[in-house]
Structure formats: structure tokens, C-alpha cells
């Protein structure tokens, strides 16, 4: 087998592979002979069909199968021979496949960059120290009362905490867009649910009033067809309703599923939830800090094929069609996020390799059981379904390995305690989920 490799652009490689004809022809003949002993054809006894008859009937199919398998086998062999590490799947272009001649094909692909993780001694991480206070509990209980409020229609101008029921219809440059209209939409003023333009327009509005609201969508919106564009909404106010909050008593606790212990048991349940939220938020804040700084400390040339694949995944997650060529103007909306994910993925994988980090099976099983318990199904059935879902299991393995890498990184870098309130922790951008 002869192999030659040329660099196309950046990390791109074009590998030409020539395979001796004997490797293909010998395998074709072997399979045809094997088939002649098994195939049933009219006019011949079982196992006595001549090879030339089998070749005439099945030769093209057998040859196609052999060519496909030989290409797969020799592609892997050629990569090993040339010490190449491809990033993603290759594009295979056959050059010669004729009977009796050497097989020749070209494989085009990106290779992984050479990576030596550096700068760990320059990473400084703030480790949040957060105490759950009685005031935090009171804030949550007040939010629960508001969430379970009854609303009563009132004949006055709308104000904060009122529920305003509206019909709206929006257009961009006179054209409708996905999600542009709704009827009887209930909106709570002052709850942070609404764009600022809607808040300003609805404050002080009364039932029966019609108004026009303009809203500019964020440039970084995941849906590129409306990102950065201004929509004009025609709004009709149908009702203004004020909240009637329930009393914080044992009956209210029972409404929330606390059958014994009343308000005190409810407070303990809320505290437990806040403790879990605190743990998760602290972890995500640490993870975001260490991964962001890891990326900043290491400059990498990124394989274009991996970025393209990540962009396609982001488009699918946003509900956009992932088919067809992506215009450059829309590509830029995804490219920064996609590049960050690819970069962190490469760095994490290199740390897994260089530090010999092995999948923690016990940690993975714990996460599996938590997923099953939170699925809303019978936990044992849910566990079995998840375990049989290969894609989900691969995603879970990658997530657990990534968490193990974060653990290792946090042991290497400099950390400093920082006291925060619970609200400061939960409202910080650093508390958002980070992922490679």
C-alpha cells in the first residue's frame, strides 16, 4: 500500500492511498466462492452453483461491498502509518476502482492540532462562600406566594405585579415571523419576563387600550432570522388583574405538597432546595472560571470541520434548519460559541490523555440514578431506557469526564475564597452553566 499526504490549508490534509489490486480481487473471489456454496439458483443443486454464474448475478454487488470495506480498512491503516490524528470523518473521493487495477482514492480531512496545555499557574479562581440565611428563605416563600396568587380583574391602570392579558401581533419590515402573535397572553409586570419596551408600554395601560410597541431583538439571539432586527407589535390590552396572595399557613404548605409539619416543614424543604441550588451554582461558577481561563491561556488552531459540525448542532438546538449552505452573515452568529466549544473540547481531551484520567464509573452511575429519579417515570424503567440509549450514554460519559477534568484543574490552579450572598451567587453570569 502506497500513501502520500499533502497539506491543503491550515490543518487540512489530502491523503492519497493506492491499494494493490490483489487485495481487492482476492477478497472478491473468496466471497464469490463462499456464495457459490450457499446460494440457491434455479437449475443448480444447492452448493453446486458455478462461480462464473454467481459472478454474473452477484459480482457487482460483492465488488462494491469489498471496495467499501477495503477503503475503510486501508484508511485506518494509512492514518496509523502516517501518524495522523483526524478531526472528524473524511471526505472520500475514489480515483481508480476498475477490475484488475490498483484501487486508488483520496481522503480529505482536518487533523487535530498539536496541543501542550500551558498557563495553569496563571489561572486564579474565586471560590464562592455562601450562607443560606432566613432572609433567603423568606424571599423564596414570598415568591411562592406570588406564583400561587389568584388574580382579580380591576378597573384601573396597570402597575408592577399586575397581570395584564393582551393580544399582540408583530412584524419585521412588514412581514410576520415565527412566534410573532398570540391571543390572551398573560404577562406579569415588573417580573423581568418582558422586554423593556413592553414593560414601558404596558405600565399605566388600561383595559381596551391599543398601543404600538417596538422591540429590537438582541444581536446574539440564537435564531439568526430575527437577531438584531426591530419588530413592531400592535398590542390590545384586554384585562388588568391584581394579585391576591395566599396566607403563609399550613393550608398553603399543604397546597405545595407538605402534608405534615406545616409551615416549618415547608421552610425546611425550601432550605434543602436552596442548598442544592447553592451547590450547583457554586460548581458552575467555578467551572466557568477555570474553563474560560484555560481557553484564554492556550491559543489553538482549530479544525474548520469541527467548527462547522458544532455550528450545525447549535442551529439544530435553536430550532433552525441545519440543511443547506449557511450565509456568512448568519454563520457569525454561531461561530464564536462554536469555536469556544471546539477549543475547550480539544483542551479537555488533551488533559484526559496526558493525565491518564479514566471514567469514574461510580460517579456516572450516581448521575444515571439521579436522571432516572427525576424523569417522572418508574426509576428502574427509566434507568433501563437511558442505559439502552447509546447516544445519551455517550453524552453522559463525556459530561462525567469533563467534570473530572474540572476537578483536576481546580487542584492545580490558584483559588481564593470570596464571600457572596445567595442572590449575588444566583444572579452572577459566572453562575451560568459552562460546558466544553
Swiss-Prot record:
Keywords associated with the record: Cell cycle, Cell division, Chaperone, Cytoplasm, Isomerase, Rotamase
Ranges for region Disordered: 1-26, 81-100
InterPro entries: PPIase_dom_sf, PPIase_FKBP_dom, Trig_fac, Trigger_fac_C, Trigger_fac_C_sf, Trigger_fac_ribosome-bd_bac, Trigger_fac_ribosome-bd_sf, Trigger_fact/SurA_dom_sf
Catalytic activity, as annotated: [protein]-peptidylproline (omega=180) = [protein]-peptidylproline (omega=0)
GO biological process: 'de novo' cotranslational protein folding; cell division; chaperone-mediated protein folding; protein transport; protein unfolding
Gene Ontology cellular-component annotations: cytoplasm
Cellular localisation: Cytoplasm
Domain PPIase FKBP-type: 161-246
EC number: 5.2.1.8
Taxonomic superkingdom: Bacteria
UniProt similarity note: Belongs to the FKBP-type PPIase family. Tig subfamily.
UniProt domain comment: Consists of 3 domains; the N-terminus binds the ribosome, the middle domain has PPIase activity, while the C-terminus has intrinsic chaperone activity on its own.
HAMAP family assigned: Trigger_factor_Tig (MF_00303)
UniProt name for this protein: Trigger factor
Annotated organism of origin: Halorhodospira halophila (strain DSM 244 / SL1) (Ectothiorhodospira halophila (strain DSM 244 / SL1))
Gene it is expressed from: tig
Amino acid at each position: 500500500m502506497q500513501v502520500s499526504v499533502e497539506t491543503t490549508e491550515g490543518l487540512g490534509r489530502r491523503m492519497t492511498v493506492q491499494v494493490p489490486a490483489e487485495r481487492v480481487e482476492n477478497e472478491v473471489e473468496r466471497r464469490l466462492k463462499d456464495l457459490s456454496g450457499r446460494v440457491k439458483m434455479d437449475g443448480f443443486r444447492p452448493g453446486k452453483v458455478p462461480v462464473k454464474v454467481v459472478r454474473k448475478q452477484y459480482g457487482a454487488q460483492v465488488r462494491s461491498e469489498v471496495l467499501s470495506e477495503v477503503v475503510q480498512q486501508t484508511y485506518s491503516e494509512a492514518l496509523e502509518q502516517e501518524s495522523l490524528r483526524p478531526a472528524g470523518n473524511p471526505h472520500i473521493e475514489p480515483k481508480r476502482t476498475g477490475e484488475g487495477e490498483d484501487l486508488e482514492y483520496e481522503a480529505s480531512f482536518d487533523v487535530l492540532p498539536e496541543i501542550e496545555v500551558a498557563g495553569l499557574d496563571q489561572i486564579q479562581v474565586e471560590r464562592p462562600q455562601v450562607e443560606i440565611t432566613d432572609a433567603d428563605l423568606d424571599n423564596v416563600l414570598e415568591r411562592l406566594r406570588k406564583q400561587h396568587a389568584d388574580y382579580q380583574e380591576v378597573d384601573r391602570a396597570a402597575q408592577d405585579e399586575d397581570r395584564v392579558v393582551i393580544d399582540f401581533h408583530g412584524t419585521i419590515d412588514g412581514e410576520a415571523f415565527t412566534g410573532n402573535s398570540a391571543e390572551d397572553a398573560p404577562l406579569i409586570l415588573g417580573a423581568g419576563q418582558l422586554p423593556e419596551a413592553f414593560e414601558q408600554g404596558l405600565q399605566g395601560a388600561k383595559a381596551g387600550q391599543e398601543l404600538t410597541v417596538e422591540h429590537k431583538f438582541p444581536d446574539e439571539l440564537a435564531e439568526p432570522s430575527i437577531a438584531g432586527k426591530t419588530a413592531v407589535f400592535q398590542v390590545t390590552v384586554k384585562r388588568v388583574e391584581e394579585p391576591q396572595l395566599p396566607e403563609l399557613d399550613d393550608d398553603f404548605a399543604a397546597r405545595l405538597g407538605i402534608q405534615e409539619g406545616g409551615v416549618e416543614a415547608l421552610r425546611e424543604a425550601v432550605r434543602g432546595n436552596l442548598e442544592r441550588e447553592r451547590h450547583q451554582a457554586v460548581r458552575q461558577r467555578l467551572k466557568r472560571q477555570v474553563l474560560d481561563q484555560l481557553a484564554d491561556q492556550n491559543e489553538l488552531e482549530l479544525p474548520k470541520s469541527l467548527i462547522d459540525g458544532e455550528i450545525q448542532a447549535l442551529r439544530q438546538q435553536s430550532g433552525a434548519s441545519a440543511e443547506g449552505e449557511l450565509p456568512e452573515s448568519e454563520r457569525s452568529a454561531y461561530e464564536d460559541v462554536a469555536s469556544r466549544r471546539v477549543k475547550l473540547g480539544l483542551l479537555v481531551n488533551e488533559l484526559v490523555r496526558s493525565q491518564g484520567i479514566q471514567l469514574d464509573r461510580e460517579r456516572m452511575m450516581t448521575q444515571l440514578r439521579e436522571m432516572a429519579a427525576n424523569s417522572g417515570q418508574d426509576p428502574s424503567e427509566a434507568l433501563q431506557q437511558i442505559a439502552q440509549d447509546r447516544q445519551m450514554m455517550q453524552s453522559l460519559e463525556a459530561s462525567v469526564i469533563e467534570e473530572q477534568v474540572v476537578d483536576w484543574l481546580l487542584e492545580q490552579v490558584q483559588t481564593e475564597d470570596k464571600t457572596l450572598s445567595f442572590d449575588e451567587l444566583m444572579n452572577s453570569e459566572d453562575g451560568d452553566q459552562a460546558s466544553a
